[in-house]
Structures are given as C-alpha cells and as structure tokens.
C-alpha cells in the first residue's frame, strides 16, 4: 500500500516548511510511521544540525530525515534527504516500505543530496558533508576578500614591445612567401594543363570513333550494293525476326500430331507406285433411289461389289492388269459425284414415298454401309481446322475409315470430303 500523508498532513507540512525556511532556526525534521500502519507522522525536529539528528535515528524503524546544511564550498544552504532503514526492521516491513521512498521524495521537494542509510556509518556528519561538497559541482575555492582597498605600492612602467627590423630575416620571409606563391601558381598551371590535355584526348577519341563508324557504314553499304541489293539495319533486323519466327513455327508444327499425320500421308503418297488420290465416292444406289426406286434392288450388288475397291486405292495392282484397264475401272467407279448433301440434308424426298419407302431406305442404307468399309457414327460436333480434316455433326455417318493412328483416323465425311478426324469423337458401327 502507498504511504498515507493526509492523516497528519498539516503537521508534516509545518515541519517541512520550518526546515526549508532559511531564517528559521529549525534545520532538521524526522518522519516515521505510526506503528505498523502506513500513516506518516512527525518523529521530531531540532536546531542542532546533523549531530543531533543522527542521535534520534532508531535502528528498529523506517524513518525519513530532511536536513538543511551549508555547502562547504559556497556557503549556500543545501538540503539533504536521508532514507533510514534500521538493521532491526524485518524483511516484510522493508519490502512494504520500499515503494514509499518515491512518495516521500515527492513530498520533501528540493533535496540536493539523497542518502540511503542502514547503519550509523552511513549517516556520519563528515560523510554527509563530503557528499554535499561533491554534489555542488566543480571542486573550486571561493576567494574571500581580505580588504576592499589595498596599497600595493608604486608599479613599474610598462615595457615596450617594439622590436628592431632585421633585414636578413625580412628578406628570408619575403623570399619564402614568394616561393610558396610561385609553387601554388605552378601547381595551378599544371592542373589546368592536365585538364586541357584530357579534354583534347577525349575530343580526339570521339573524332576517331565517328570516323571509324562512318568508314564501317560505308563498307557495309558498298558490300550490300555489290551483293545486288540495298539493305538497311532495319531490314536486316526484320529478316532475322522472320527467320526466328519461321524456325519457331516449324518447331511447333513438328510437335503437333496433325503435322505428324500430314508427314506420314505425304510419305505414303511418294512411296506408292501408282496410288491415285481418292476422289469423291459416288453412291449409285442413292441416285437411282431418287429416280428409279423400283429397280434399285437389282443393281445394288454391283455398287456394293465395286465400293471396296474404291476404299482401298493403295493396294498393289495385279502385274497382269494393264494400266489402261485400271484407269478404265477407276473412271467407272470414281465419277465426279454430285454433292452428297441430299443423302443427309434432304430426307423429306424419301419420306414422301410412305411407310413402304422408309423400309426400303433403311434396307438400302444398311446395304450401302456394308460396302463402304469401316463406318462410324459421330458422337459430338467437330469442325475441321484445315482442308486436311473433315467436319461433322452428331449422328452423322463417316465411311471408308482408315485407322492410321490411335487418336486420329481418316475417312469420308457427310459431304464426301476425305480427311482426318479425332477417333474419340465417333463410335464404330458393327
């Protein structure tokens, strides 16, 4: 708990004021606690100085002393605060009163020296005055006036400070000054000369560099003219960028699966001896279905027989077959077909024939698919990326399929165009 200064406040304040008043004979005041409480009370005051105050200290109590003494150096009044903790005070009380020191220091303001004492050796008057002397600042001594006016007797005349001029020393001094002035001037000239030479060397280097660049530019221009074309640095840079872009495109295209299939197809076309390009497959039975549906069943086997030969154009021909017969057969099978869109785009023409016609159409379609090689039905929509691929919609039929790779096949699309398509976009028809 904090120290209580309000209970005995007037008495405490009165004792403090009597000590700090310079004309008051009271020069010390002693404060302590009331029993084991935290209430501060006045233990005593006196006019006998430090010797009298020391005798009032009790070794079994916690006490606070505030004294007025004279500075031995300046003779000015100084105030000393002594925090006394007797040797007989128990540890619990010491711990409780340790926080009251700052409270008492705030109440007893103006102390020049603060002493924490526990034994009589710490509060001896000589020891206290020594600390006061050290706290007053520098250890100086004040001169005391022995007399305002003193007759010290006649004073001797003031001596002259005139010195005769020495010509030799003067000449030496002047010569020395001129020597240093000349040295400074020479140093300044040397620095200016070095600066001028550096600037001249820099200008010469710049001139040589410009001349060298002009000569190199002239040689390049002459070399370009000799090669038969005028080139500029911008054009050279553009050509380099074109080469880099072309190389990058070639590398990217070499990695793309579609380009791999294109290369395989070109290799197959160059190695084959006489493999004609597959043309658009003409469906004889479709044309005759639209014109003569009643006679279609009689001529369908011929178309079914000739279709497998069209689906395998790369088979090696028989050695005994002359080229003219092969050409004749190809012309018989590969005619310039009309657009096959009518087979898928115009189903109403067939539906107008009635229920009997629909049965005939399904039968004809089954016979046609059986003669067109491997067939598949589209599951998803796919749009061709270039002219080497085919486009189709869901439920479209793809005929004449060639399995050239695990992921990409080739076949005839709904429009009769032959090209590649992704294998996972279709399902095979058994």
Curated annotation (Swiss-Prot):
GO terms for cellular component: anchoring junction; cell cortex; clathrin-coated vesicle membrane; cytoplasm; cytosol; dendrite; early endosome; extracellular exosome. Belongs to the ABP1 family. The modification N6-acetyllysine is found at residues 176, 288. The modification Phosphothreonine is found at residues 26, 291. GO terms for molecular function: actin binding; actin filament binding; cadherin binding; enzyme activator activity; protein domain specific binding; structural constituent of postsynaptic actin cytoskeleton. The modification Phosphoserine is found at residues 160, 232, 269, 272, 275, 283. Keywords: Acetylation, Actin-binding, Adaptive immunity, Cell junction, Cell membrane, Cell projection, Coiled coil, Cytoplasm, Cytoplasmic vesicle, Cytoskeleton, Endocytosis, Endosome, Golgi apparatus, Immunity, Membrane, Phosphoprotein, SH3 domain, Synapse, Transport. Its main location: cytoplasm. It comes from Homo sapiens. The keyword Cell membrane applies. Adapter protein that binds F-actin and DNM1, and thereby plays a role in receptor-mediated endocytosis. Plays a role in the reorganization of the actin cytoskeleton, formation of cell projections, such as neurites, in neuron morphogenesis and synapse formation via its interaction with WASL and COBL. Does not bind G-actin and promote actin polymerization by itself. Required for the formation of organized podosome rosettes. May act as a common effector of antigen receptor-signaling pathways in leukocytes. Residues 4-133 form the ADF-H domain. The SH3 domain mediates interaction with SHANK2, SHANK3 and PRAM1. It comes from the Eukaryota. This is Drebrin-like protein. Signal peptide: none annotated. Residues 245-267 have a biased composition (Basic and acidic residues).
């Amino acid at each position: 708990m904090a120290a209580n200064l309000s209970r005995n406040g007037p008495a405490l304040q009165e004792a403090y004021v009597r000590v700090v008043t310079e004309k008051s004979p009271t020069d010390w005041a002693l404060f302590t606690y009331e029993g084991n409480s935290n209430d501060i009370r006045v233990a005593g005051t006196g006019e006998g100085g430090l010797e009298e105050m020391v005798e009032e200290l009790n070794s079994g109590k916690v006490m606070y002393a505030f004294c007025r003494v004279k500075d031995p150096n300046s003779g000015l009044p100084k105030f000393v605060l002594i925090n006394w903790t007797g040797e007989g005070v128990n540890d619990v009380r010491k711990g409780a009163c340790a926080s009251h020191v700052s409270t008492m220091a705030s109440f007893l303001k103006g102390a020049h020296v603060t002493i924490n004492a526990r034994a009589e050796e710490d509060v001896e008057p000589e020891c206290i005055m020594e600390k006061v002397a050290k706290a007053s600042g520098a250890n100086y001594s004040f001169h005391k006036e022995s007399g305002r006016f003193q007759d010290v007797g006649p004073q001797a005349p003031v001596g002259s400070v005139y010195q005769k001029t020495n010509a030799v020393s003067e000449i030496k001094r002047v010569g020395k000054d001129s020597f240093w002035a000349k040295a400074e001037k020479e140093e300044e000239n040397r620095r200016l000369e070095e600066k001028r030479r550096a600037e001249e060397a820099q200008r010469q280097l710049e001139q040589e560099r410009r001349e060298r660049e002009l000569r190199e530019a002239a040689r390049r221009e002459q070399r370009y003219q000799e090669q038969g074309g005028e080139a500029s640095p911008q054009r050279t840079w553009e050509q380099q960028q074109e080469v880099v872009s072309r190389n990058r495109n070639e590398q990217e295209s070499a990695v793309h699966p579609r380009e791999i299939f294109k290369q395989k197809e070109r290799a197959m076309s160059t190695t084959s001896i006489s493999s004609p390009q597959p043309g658009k497959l003409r469906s004889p039975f479709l044309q005759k279905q639209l014109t003569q549906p009643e006679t279609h069943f009689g001529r369908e086997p011929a178309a079914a027989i000739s279709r497998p030969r069209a689906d395998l154009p790369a088979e090696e021909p028989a050695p005994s077959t002359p080229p003219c017969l092969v050409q004749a057969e190809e012309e018989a099978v590969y005619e310039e077909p009309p657009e096959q869109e009518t087979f898928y785009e115009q189903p109403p023409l067939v539906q107008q024939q009635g229920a009997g016609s629909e049965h005939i159409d399904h039968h004809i379609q089954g016979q046609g698919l059986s003669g067109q090689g491997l067939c598949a039905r589209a599951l998803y929509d796919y749009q061709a990326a270039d002219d080497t691929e085919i486009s189709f919609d869901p439920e479209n039929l793809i005929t004449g399929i060639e399995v050239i790779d695990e992921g990409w096949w080739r076949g005839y699309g709904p429009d009769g165009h032959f090209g590649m398509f992704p294998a996972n976009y279709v399902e095979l028809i058994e």
